[in-house]
Design a protein with these regions (language model features):
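Basic/polar N-terminal segments that are highly enriched at the extreme N-terminus
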Residues: 1-2, 431
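Core alpha/beta nucleotide-donor-binding catalytic domains of modification enzymes
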Residues: 2-120, 129-144
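Extracellular structured ligand-interaction cores
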Residues: 4-7, 174-178, 341-343
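Class I S-adenosyl-L-methionine
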Residues: 70-77, 89-333
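Short loop/turn segments at secondary-structure transitions that flank enzyme active sites
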Residues: 83, 183-187, 352, 383
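C-terminal target-recognition/interaction regions appended to catalytic cores
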Residues: 251-431
Length: 431
């Protein structure tokens, strides 16, 4: 085994993947390259936080679409990691090349594929919102099938699982889909071939050859155990078309929360966690009250009433774009967040006056969570996002609003650490 595994972190944000991998094994995992670009903002705050903490790697602050192939080609990364946006993955025939495909401009998944084509890493670990598996609404599962086909075309297998961090002992009910992608010429892939593949491909569809992989042998099964049977016998197999455009136009299939794609076929099961791990309650990650600044308390009656209204049930008459009226209804939720339960999913709007913001009551007073508490919900070190380094080298403080925005976009780093722990075991198996 190499003395170190070199990592390229794409869509790096403030470094969640890097924290997770380094917390697993800082001597083994070396993030030598990163890319972070916020297209909708003039200031590049997330990049500046990342660069403050990790000045020694090659940190690229430009639109990934503008990074030339030649730069990727020079990166001898063993692993690519990243959490990428959920977008429209549909493809069409290229007008310049009838045999080629063309994704919609600005869809960043295709930049991952471009990087993989140039770098040819052994492994990828990727993250996205769980609704990706059901997108788009009019052709459920199509986008994910396109992604699987793209990796298959490059000679990779893909294992996936939707993971709710709270179901594996963390302090936030955050559901995300994680992918473990591995090249088909790795020793791990060859080992899986010997164990699960059959010379008669039809057997794959008539049996449950990959059940043992999904329930026991796969990366996610080892670190995030599940009950050994599908929910309501929900399982499906599907042979992907060799034509990605055909998948884009005609895919009709099922994708459950757990699965494996190998050699152009996928097997998917709807699974449930063993629930053996107790989540950390919200109350346990709160700062000591004497350290909480008064600005986080909500004392204004109008703001208190606004929170009460937003969290309450309501029926509102609205008018559609076409002009017809309809009733928008919203169920009620508890007036404040239960400190005995793990936190809810943080959004980028955390800390503003809205329904999704955490709103807590302590000793008869109401307040929002602090930036440090937001960092703890994502398993980041305290004050990780407090400072950033500007292009002129000056270090300045980051606003609370931006710190909350960062954490709403981030991932639970302890989940990443566990994935990295198991990847290390798999790499050792490759010896």
């Amino acid at each position: 085994m190499n003395k170190e595994l070199k990592i390229l972190e794409l869509f790096a944000g403030v470094g969640g993947f890097r924290i997770g991998f380094e917390n697993s094994n800082k001597e083994l995992y070396k993030t030598n390259w990163s890319n972070q670009w916020e297209p909708s903002r003039k200031t590049q705050d997330a990049f500046e936080v990342y660069n403050y903490h990790f000045p020694d790697s090659m940190n690229i602050n430009e639109n990934i679409e503008e990074i030339p192939d030649s730069i990727f080609k020079k990166m001898d990364a063993d692993i690519i990691v990243g959490g990428f946006p959920c977008q429209d993955y549909s493809v069409a025939r290229s007008k310049k090349n009838e045999m080629g495909i063309q994704g919609k401009k600005g869809v960043l998944f295709w930049e991952i594929i471009r990087a993989v084509t140039q770098i040819k890493p052994q492994y990828l670990v990727l993250e996205n919102v769980d609704r990706l598996l059901k997108a788009p609404s009019k052709q459920r599962g199509r986008d994910f099938a396109i992604m699987l086909a793209a990796f298959n075309e490059l000679g990779y297998s893909v294992e996936w699982r939707i993971i709710n961090a709270a179901e594996y002992g963390r302090s936030q009910r955050r559901r995300r889909v994680f992918f473990f992608v591995y090249r088909n010429d790795t020793a791990f892939a060859k080992k899986m071939d010997r164990k699960f593949e059959s010379e008669n491909s039809d057997v794959f569809f008539e049996s449950h050859l990959y059940d043992e992989y999904i329930f026991n042998d796969g990366l996610f099964a080892r670190q995030f155990p599940i009950l050994p049977q599908p929910i309501k016998n929900r399982h499906a197999t599907y042979k992907l078309s060799s034509d990605i455009v055909d998948i884009s136009d005609n895919f009709i299939g099922t994708v459950w929360n757990t699965g494996i794609m190998r050699h152009g076929r996928y097997f998917t099961i709807d699974t449930v966690p063993t629930m053996e791990e107790t989540p950390i309650p919200l109350g346990k990650i709160l700062e000591d009250e004497e350290n909480v600044h008064e600005k986080y308390y909500v004392t204004d009656e109008k703001r208190l009433e606004k929170f009460k209204y937003l969290r309450g049930s309501k029926k509102i008459e609205r008018t559609s774009v076409e002009g017809h009226k309809y009733i928008y209804s919203e169920g009620g939720m508890a007036p404040t967040d239960d400190l005995k339960l793990p936190g809810r999913t943080m959004l980028t709007s955390e800390g503003t006056v809205n329904r999704s913001t955490h709103f807590i009551e302590l000793n008869g007073r109401y307040r929002l969570i602090t930036p440090i508490e937001a960092e703890r919900l994502q398993d980041f070190p305290d004050n990780w996002t407090k400072f950033k380094k500007l292009s002129d080298g000056n270090v300045v403080e980051v606003s609370d609003r931006m710190r909350m925005f960062f954490m709403g976009n981030a991932l639970v780093t302890e989940i990443v650490k566990r994935i990295a722990d198991e990847l290390q075991n798999i790499v050792f198996e490759d010896i």
